[in-house]
């Protein structure tokens, strides 16, 4: 049985409240779970102690049993100092493409050439006046 430690949504419309649960990965998100491990209330301030509450003993038990935490639960465990921080893959989607990089280089080259040209012009005028 593939186990997950994940969030099960509760609360009302626009007022989310989550239970941290250990459940079979094939069950629905808010469906049947094996054990409630804690709570997460995103409406509380980030520095509040009541925002995330977990029974770390039971979480460790399920991790030892082979349960896989979801991304959000992994971040909670990292913040609690329970697991080491993972190196996350930075998405390349936000970086400019090849064409945009080429255009930026061309624009920078033109700007530097334009900056050099006016600097040479006054020197030529000074030589002509003498």
UniProtKB/Swiss-Prot annotation:
Domain of life: Bacteria
GO molecular function: structural constituent of ribosome
Keywords: Ribonucleoprotein, Ribosomal protein
NCBIfam families named in the record: S16 (TIGR00002)
Biased composition, class Basic and acidic residues, residue ranges: 99-109
Entries under Pfam families matching the protein: Ribosomal_S16
Species the sequence originates in: Jannaschia sp. (strain CCS1)
HAMAP family: Ribosomal_bS16
UniProt key word Ribosomal protein: yes
Residue numbers spanned by region Disordered: 80-130
Cited InterPro entries: Ribosomal_bS16, Ribosomal_bS16_dom_sf
Family: Belongs to the bacterial ribosomal protein bS16 family.
SUPFAM superfamilies in the record: Ribosomal protein S16
Protein's UniProt name: Small ribosomal subunit protein bS16
BP GO annotations: translation
Compositionally biased tracts (Low complexity): 110-130
GO CC terms, sorted: cytoplasm; small ribosomal subunit
